[in-house]
């Protein structure tokens, strides 16, 4: 089955090993994911892309035990899904949003995993909120919980992020790597919105990159230089330089405070008044300020 939006094509390939009911659930799920992805640029990041869904053993709690993005002439997102998973269960799972978010940048597929996984980890929560699966409160709670998991991953505390990221597949440190990257993108998003009084955002900055270079295959240093150049800011490269040598996840509390978010007993609380409320809501809804 194919989905078409704004002249762009998404091929959906579902294994015939799924029942007809499961196939309907899977197409409904992909339709929700692809709709959420459109909230970033107003269109999909690729003109022609595909998703391939195969059955996974139904012997665990995770409805999507494995997924990956394969870059190529046609970018492909591959999911292995439990045959018993329903559409609502799939929509509540973070995995689909995470994998689709990888397509937001023209990444060459190697180096600086913290950057690409951080992008996907940040946007997986934002996209869930924008699709209506979770509310704004839950989105910030999920981000807080993620940063806490990253802070608890102390095995490589004191080692530079770039080094931990390079060795992650062999040695571990996934939470430190992923959530340091998610901090990078939250920090960039908030600074862009604050400093431009809402004229800029991470969505808009990445859209400029997509417009320029969607068909390119760029390294992360290339990407951050392009983001600064295209958006006429001094932010992405300097923040990259800061993060890659960081020896722990930077403090998220000042960012949360600037958005009117406090934490008590592990639960986020959202202030309803103050200068950060509109910015906070804009991130969750995708609405330009």
PLM segments and residue spans:
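Juxtacatalytic substrate-recognition/specificity segment
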Residues: 2-112
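Soluble non-cytosolic domains of exported or imported proteins
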Residues: 20-32, 86-91, 95, 110, ...
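Hydrophobic/aromatic-lined pockets within catalytic cores
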Residues: 38, 42-45, 101, 105-109, ...
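Surface-exposed patches in mature extracellular/periplasmic domains of secreted proteins
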Residues: 43-53, 107-113, 131-140, 199-205, ...
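Acidic/His/Gly-enriched intrinsically disordered linker/tail segments
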Residues: 90, 111-182, 195-196, 207, ...
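Hydrophobic, well-ordered secondary-structure elements that form the walls
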Residues: 120, 185, 198, 227, ...
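Carbohydrate-binding surfaces of carbohydrate-active enzymes
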Residues: 187-192, 196-200, 204-217, 221-225
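Beta/coil-rich, acidic/histidine-enriched accessory regions frequently appended to metallopeptidases
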Residues: 212-289
């Amino acid at each position: 089955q194919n989905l078409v939006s704004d002249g762009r094509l998404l091929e959906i390939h579902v294994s015939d090993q799924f029942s007809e009911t499961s196939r309907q659930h899977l197409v409904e799920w992909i339709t929700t994911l692809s709709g959420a992805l459109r909230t970033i640029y107003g269109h999909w990041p690729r003109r022609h892309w595909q998703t391939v869904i195969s059955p996974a053993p139904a012997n665990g709690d995770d409805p999507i035990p494995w997924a990956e993005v394969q870059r190529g002439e046609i970018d492909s997102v591959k999911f292995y899904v439990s045959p018993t998973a329903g559409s609502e269960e799939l929509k509540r799972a973070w995995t689909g949003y995470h994998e689709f978010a990888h397509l937001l940048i023209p990444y060459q597929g190697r180096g600086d995993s913290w950057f690409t996984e951080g992008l996907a980890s940040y946007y997986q929560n934002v996209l869930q909120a924008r699709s209506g699966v979770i509310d704004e409160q839950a989105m910030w709670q999920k981000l807080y919980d993620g940063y806490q998991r990253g802070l608890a991953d102390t095995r490589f505390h004191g080692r530079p992020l770039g080094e931990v990221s390079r060795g992650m597949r062999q040695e571990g440190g996934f939470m430190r790597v992923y959530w340091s990257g998610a901090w990078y993108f939250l920090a960039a998003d908030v600074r862009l919105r604050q400093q431009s009084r809402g004229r800029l955002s991470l969505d808009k900055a990445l859209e400029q990159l997509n417009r320029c270079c969607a068909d390119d295959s760029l390294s992360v240093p290339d990407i951050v230089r392009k983001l600064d150049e295209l958006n006429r800011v001094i932010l992405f490269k300097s923040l990259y330089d800061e993060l890659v040598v960081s020896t722990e996840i930077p403090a998220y509390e000042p960012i949360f405070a600037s958005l009117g978010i406090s934490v008590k007993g592990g639960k986020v609380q959202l202030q309803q008044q103050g200068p950060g409320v509109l910015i906070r809501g804009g991130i969750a809804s995708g609405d330009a300020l």
